[in-house]
């Protein structure tokens, strides 16, 4: 997870250098998709952990 944070930090820096042009919109779109993917994965992880403890 830390790897993805570092990747998006680098993408954000590149987008800032290029003046928040097309790369920023693309990175924001990817970030939105990955946010929901990781949200679902986190919920599945919490649910599976709760079910294993029972």
UniProtKB/Swiss-Prot annotation:
Keywords: Cell membrane, Membrane, Transmembrane, Transmembrane helix. It is found in: Cell membrane. Pfam families: DUF1328. The keyword Transferase does not apply. GO terms for cellular component: plasma membrane. It is a multi-pass membrane protein. It comes from the Bacteria. InterPro entries: DUF1328 (IPR009760). The chain crosses the membrane at residues 5-25, 27-47. Belongs to the UPF0391 family. HAMAP family: UPF0391. This is UPF0391 membrane protein BAV1230. It comes from Bordetella avium (strain 197N).
